[in-house]
C-alpha cells in the first residue's frame, strides 16, 4: 500500500534488529527498493521507544519546522490517499490547534481481514477510539514525543486529536501471530465480499479476490 500512494513525497524507515539474518535483510531491501524515500535501518537491542525515536530522527529533513510520523505494521495496509489526506488535514488543522502543541490525526473507518483456515472473513469497522493503524502525530522538530509515546486508544486524552470517520482508510489483518488484541472499539459488522469489492478496489491497490486468497 505504500508503493501505491497518490502522494509519494514521504520518507519511510524500516527498522530492524542487527540480528536479522542477511538472507531476510536482503529480501526486505529488495522489496522496498522501488519505494522512494525508503531507508532500512538496523539498530542494536534497545527499548522500543528509544529505537523509534532514533528512526524518526534519521528520517527528519534538516529544513523542516514540523514532522508528521505515522504508525504502520508490516501486515496491515493503508488506502491509496492516506499520505495526501494526512498532509491536507494537518495543513488545515495545525494553525487552529497551535503550532507548538502535538496534533494527532487518523481514520476511524476501515476493514478487518480475519485469516482463517476455512476461508478468510472481512469485517467493516468504524472505531470509537483511535486505531493505531495509520495514526499520525505532528510536532515541532526536536520535540521528543511521537505517535508511539502513548497507547493509541487514549490519544484524545493527551493530545488534540482528529479522526476521519468517512473514508475506508485501512485494512487490518487479524491472524494467530498478532501481538496485540485485534478488537474493534466501536461498530463492527461482517461484510459480504461481493458488496465490499467495489470499495476495496476504489480505495486500495488490490482487489477483494486477492484478499480472500491471502
Question: Could you tell me what each predicted segment is?
Answer:
Residues 1-9, 34:
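Short, acidic, metal-binding catalytic loop of nucleotide-sugar glycosyltransferases
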Residues 20-24, 79, 113-115, 179-182:
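Short catalytic/ligand-binding loop motif for oxyanion handling, primarily in non-cytosolic enzymes
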Amino acid at each position: 500500500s505504500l508503493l501505491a500512494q497518490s502522494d509519494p513525497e514521504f520518507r519511510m524507515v524500516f527498522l530492524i534488529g542487527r540480528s536479522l539474518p542477511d538472507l531476510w535483510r536482503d529480501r526486505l531491501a529488495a522489496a522496498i527498493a522501488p519505494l522512494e524515500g525508503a531507508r532500512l535501518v538496523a539498530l542494536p537491542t534497545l527499548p522500543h521507544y528509544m529505537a523509534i525515536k532514533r528512526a524518526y530522527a534519521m528520517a527528519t529533513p534538516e529544513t523542516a519546522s514540523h514532522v508528521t510520523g505515522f504508525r504502520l505494521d508490516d501486515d496491515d495496509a493503508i488506502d491509496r490517499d492516506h499520505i495526501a489526506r494526512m498532509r491536507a488535514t494537518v495543513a488545515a488543522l495545525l494553525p487552529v490547534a497551535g503550532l507548538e502543541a502535538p496534533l494527532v490525526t487518523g481514520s476511524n473507518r476501515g476493514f478487518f481481514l480475519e485469516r482463517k483456515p476455512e476461508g478468510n472473513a472481512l469485517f467493516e469497522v468504524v472505531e470509537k477510539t483511535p486505531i493505531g493503524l495509520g495514526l499520525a502525530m505532528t510536532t515541532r522538530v526536536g520535540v521528543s514525543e511521537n505517535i508511539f509515546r502513548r497507547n493509541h486508544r487514549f490519544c484524545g486524552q493527551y493530545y488534540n486529536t482528529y479522526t476521519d470517520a468517512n473514508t475506508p482508510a485501512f485494512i487490518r489483518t487479524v491472524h494467530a501471530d498478532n501481538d496485540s488484541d485485534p478488537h474493534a472499539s466501536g461498530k463492527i459488522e461482517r461484510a459480504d465480499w461481493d458488496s465490499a469489492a467495489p470499495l476495496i478496489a476504489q480505495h486500495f491497490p488490490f482487489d477483494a479476490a486477492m484478499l480472500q486468497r491471502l
